[in-house]
Amino acid sequence: MNCQRYFCFVNGIVEIRTAPEEYQNKPVLVGSQSDGLLIIDNHADIEDGIFSTLHIGNGYNGAVDVINGAALHMDNRSGSAPLIVGAFGNDIAGKLNISGRNSIVSYRDTPSSSGHNESIYVGFGPGATGWINIFNGGVFEVLNSTNIYVGSDTPGGGDGSIVIDGSNSKMTADFSEAYVGLYGNGDISLKNGGQLSASNLYIGGNGRAIVNISGTDSRLIANMITISGSSGAPGIYIADQGILNVDNYINITTANDTKGKLFINSDMPGTIESKGILFGVGKAELIFKHNSDNYAFSSPLISKNTGNGIINAESGETHLTGDNTDYSGLLNILPTASIDISSQKNIGKSVIVNNGVLQITSQDDWTFNNNMTGNGYLNVHTGGHNFAFQNSTNTQEFTGTLALSDTLFDLSDDNTTALTSALVLAGVGSVITAGTGTQVINGFSFDGGAVNFGAVTQGAQQTESQIQVTDNLYINGNGAVRVSTPTDVNGIPQVINSSLSLLEQDDSNATIKLVDASSAVVKGNGGNLQLQDASGQVISSGKQRNIVQQGKNVAKGVYDYRLTSGPHNDGLYIGYALTQLDLLASGVDALVLDAAGTTGNAADMSARITGAGDLAFNSQKGETVSLSNQDNDYTGVTAIRGGNVLMNSNSVLGQTSEIRLATDTRLDMNGHSQTVGKLNGAAGSVLNINGGNLTLTDDGVSAGTLTGGGFLNISGGVLDITGGNHTFAVSTIIAKDATVRMNDVSGLGTGNISNAGTLSLTHASGLLSNNLSGSGTVSLINSDTQISGNNSNYSGLFVVDTSSQLTATGAQNLGIASVSNRGILQLNNTTDWQLINNVTGTGNVRKTGSGSLTVRSNAAWSGQTDIDDGSLILGQSDAPVMLASSLVNIAKNGKLTGFGGVVGNVTNSGSLDLRSAAPGNILTIGGNYTGNNGTLLINTVLDDSSSATDKLVIKGDASGKTRVAVTNVGGSGANTLNSIEVIHVDGNAANAEFIQAGRIAAGAYDYTLGRGPGSNYGNWYLSSSKNTPEPRPDPEPTPEGHDNNLRPEASSYTANIAAANTMFVTRLHERLGQTQYVDAITGEPKATSMWMRHEGGHNRWRDGSGQLKTQSNRYVIQLGGDIAQWDWGGTNRWHLGVMAGYGNNHSSTGAVRTGYHSKGSVNGYSTGLYATWYADDETHNGAYLDTWAQYGWFDNHVKGDGLPGESWKSKGLTASLETGYAWKIGEFSSNYGNLNEWYVQPQAQLVWMGVKADELYESNGTLIESTGDGNVHTRLGVKTWIKRLNKMDDGKSREFSPFVEVNWLHNTRDFGVRMNGEPVYQDGTRNIGEVKTGVEGQINPHLNLWGNVRVQVGDKGYNDTSAMLGVKYTF
């Protein structure tokens, strides 16, 4: 940092780890020409006065990081803004990051700072964005009245964000105003105990405005909060016990038709403490969406203008307790929500849309004066006080229910008109007084309350007050009807019409009409309603008579005043009729109810049925008798002998000890509840729960059909269910002492089963699809059952007997239950499964399906284990499992893997996989092992004898054939002087065969699997040596030489690098011939040569160990020609030429020890220059000098048996210098006058070979490095030839020169390869003898041919044979 007299500045990054004295009381600027970053770290404490001002990023992005307990304290002595982070640039950003316990940034003013600019800017200037991030106990405190701008403070956009996360993380600005995104988006997030306090807080401006407060002790404290936003969904979201504390008002305003939200959500909603919530312009919204049933909201709600504000209650029960008198916005209650109030001021003048519950609880009179629509519930409880509607028009569109409890209500005038579209429910403790005349409402229901209809006129057919319903009349509940002149009721004829059926006698003499429902639907028959006087006393004049059927007294009937829906079921009447039946007879003598062709009320019994006798039903097939009195309490048998029975209310079957359903009969519970002792349904009968709730307390048999939805509770005894019930969809509860026995998996249909008792399946096969829960027992007896439901909440016990099979396909099927298995447990999973269930027993466990099954110590079964498909995984590395199974059968598609082992025997027809993340896994078989052409898979670090490896330990005997596949994990290959033990057999292994499966290769070596010698004959070892040695001595001696199994690929790599360096090596006499050309410089006719040669060769050699035998075939084509000649006078001449070539070499290597083979190939191109000097260019006698240089590039490939193919490239330079001297040692004539000239030419050549191969990593990780480049190849030899001149060829320019050449070749380096550093080289090439013979000839002035055959012989069986043909054509 550059500190001058008055200020300090720097560009880029400044990190301060100790308090810097040189900055004392000076302005500091970081980033004047680039982004600036100031890091204060390592508990550095920057005290007041060190920085007079701090500006980070001047026209660039800026950031301040105060971390790891560091502190930055500032005051305002300079008179300018004390802290600016990121300023004066379009779209720049400023960040203040405070993280770590005791990390703090603080600012306080000084007495001398009066009138100074005390604002703090994080993101300064038009369009600037600002972030304040406080984590892990960091603190930002402003200790005086200072404006804080997060994001731009001037128009032009610019977002602001404050994130405070973690306990003790806080920002304190109690005397300051904070602006977050004043002209853009504003975001504040307080999490996990983060806290923010400010005097006034302004969030958002031209964009989004969001505040999130979540987590215990997360708290936002302010004197006033203003949320503004013109886009998105601006608002405050409070969850998980977060706290919003505002001393003044929370102001929610929006623009551009957006919604501003104050959101209370989560299971544990947060708290708001404020002077009030101001709903301003726009769609300002308060949302309650939580799961609490007792959440209190006390902040007052205020509409700035009439109609401002929306309160959405989306879920949970919210108590509005504040003074909301000035709220005139919308209160919207959704079906899953409830709003509770105790004072009119709690809902103010709100307009209510009620599709949920509005609960009024008060101890005073209540006049409802709000406008309300919707179809929900208005529940009113006034503690015995009056409730009324102030204005009849406010609720005329409310189509829901007015539910009154402990409340007085006058059904007349405005109260009646207000309920034009609603239903009135008379709840417990409520008294409704019907006004004089007819009161028309939508619907009426009794639920324990009373209705006072006033006086009854003697002889009249109605009371002075009557109710008319237009939609529904519910008289199937409890309640009371009151009249004020009970003596006039006595005028009703007390006549018993014996000519009517018993089912019609409960509706007879319906004389005085109280409720007219002639255009409505009537549900129930009024049998549970009492007739009372005005004081609530029962009006009664009862008579009793015997009920005789078939000459026997079967019951006693009681006749009295009662309420009824009348014979036509068209309202509510006072009549004199049957009110009670006391059952006396049982069995065949039981009271019989018979529809006898009637329907409706004529086939309904609304009188109370009591007594200890039985009740029988015997209608014709298809005819129905209904019961509608929920006070029935008879205890005898309910025998449905014929026809159907319909329940029209709860408990209409009383306390019956048994329901008997005969063939072709039907009981329809019609959505109602009933408790009975036994259920006995005959085959062909139907029990339709139909949305109801049936409880069985004793034994029973269901041989008929069970159907419908609802609930079935078996609280005791044994219920036998015969056959399937596919349309039965109830939720079944089996209590602790109860049992359900089924012979069909769909006996309980498809619904959920909560089982705390016993669910027994006998001879039941198929899919049990029900979702199970509870802690009871599911027992299989001679059954083959697959459980397919989601039983995650089932913690009970599955019991499988010896003749049964239980099948599960996933963890959710078994839940967390235990399994006691004496039969077959089949786990048929196609996805991976961690078995957490305790499984015991002597039965078989069968693993099928392609997924894996991992077992822990909970796998305690001792029976046989069959792994038919997929994998069975034992334990984990730190928690191995010894499977207690007596026998494990691994099928062809199965695999056993993991850690630990098997207590019993193992038969392997599939895979026994010991591999894991690191080698060293030892799997133990406590019994015998039988290989049935299965595979053993292990990981080994293929190095020396001490290498880490997986191992199979067999405590018993071993037999059969097993393939062993070894994977190298990081081994580089080495000489295993004493081998690596991978299989150990304590018992007899004479009949066992563990056979190596595929190549086991690492580095330069092939490892082989074989038995140990001598006493270790029962063990199997991996070795890279020729023979399996005795066990390792201690200490292990150092290996010497190559007494190990080399990989054939080593010689393939070697053959490639050797061929690439040698295939384009040429000699002068392989480029013979001359043509004429015009010198490009002098224009004189000159002699030139244009040549091409073809060579094919065959090569044989061995590596240095003698293990690898290689032979290869090559082909080379080269062509070239002179491009310039010059001389220095006389007959000497220089020739300069160019040449190019293509060649390929294909090799094959066999390893004599292992029998493995590999193939290699290399093909490439070369281009180069040559230069030749002849002392006598005309005769080529005397001395010559020849040199050339070529650059070659090659593609290489190697493929070994059982290994992936490898490819790489090589390239480099080769160069040669050759010299010799030719002279004619004589001439002689032969027959026919032919002249023969004899020449001898000693030769010497020096070739430098510099082709290098790229470094290669094989697929198995072996590093391949070719060697031998830089070899200097020398040749010393002599060539002799005879030039024959035949008289027949005079003037034809035809001549022939047969020759013989002998050479000694020497190489300074051997071509080879290093495989993971282990060298393998081509042997026998240091000194090579060569014999070559051929002929050179000119056919005519235009065509020259030459060819030769060459044989090279070296040491160690090296030999090379080649043939070459050259051709020249003169144009």
UniProtKB/Swiss-Prot annotation:
Disulfide bonds: none annotated. SUPFAM superfamilies: Autotransporter, Pectin lyase-like. One of its GO terms (cellular component) is cell outer membrane. Gene3D superfamilies: 2.160.20.20, Autotransporter beta-domain (2.40.128.130). Its main location: membrane. InterPro entries: AC_1, Autotransporte_beta, Autotransporte_beta_dom_sf, Autotransporter_pectin_lyase_C, Bact_Autotransporter_VF, OM_autotransptr_brl_dom, Pectin_lyase_fold/virulence. Residues 1083-1371 form the Autotransporter domain. The keyword Chaperone does not apply. The keyword Membrane applies. It is found in: Cell outer membrane. Keywords: Cell outer membrane, Membrane, Plasmid, Transmembrane, Transmembrane beta strand. Residues 1029-1046 have a biased composition (Basic and acidic residues). It is a peripheral membrane protein. It comes from the Bacteria. Pfam families: AC_1 (PF18883), Autotransporter (PF03797). Residues 1020-1048 are annotated as: Disordered. This is Uncharacterized protein YuaQ.
